[in-house]
Amino acid sequence: MDTHHQRFGKIIRGRRAAKGLGQEALADKAGLHRTHVSLLERGKRMPTLEVVRKLAAGLGTTMASLMGELEAGGEGKTAGSGGEATPKAV
């Protein structure tokens, strides 16, 4: 089972690839270093809220979208999007 770190990394990698961006291009757009993006994508680091904000901006999306996908289990699913995945009731 993937950790939150690994799932978040897969989400960032998938979103970046879907936009046709390399790690360097995303890093430039987000104001981050390429190695930081690499560490995040490999699940070696969990980002701060500020880094999530920067990544979202670099990917042309929102923090809520990224976090919603994380909570929905990653793999391109978003909470409440056509019944693909929904967050667990608390």
PLM regions: where:
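DNA major-groove recognition helix of helix-turn-helix/homeodomain DNA-binding modules
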Residues: 50-65
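A detector for short, charged/polar N-terminal pre-domain segments
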Residues: 1-7, 77
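Conserved hydrophobic/aromatic packing and binding residues within compact polymer-binding modules
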Residues: 12, 26-27, 37-40, 66
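Recognition helix of helix-turn-helix/homeodomain-like DNA-binding domains
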Residues: 31-45
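Short basic helix-loop element that most often maps to the first helix and adjoining turn
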Residues: 10-29, 89
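Helix-turn-helix DNA-binding elements, focusing on the entry/boundary residues of the two helices
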Residues: 12, 23, 34, 49-52
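Short, charged recognition helix plus adjacent turn
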Residues: 57, 67-90
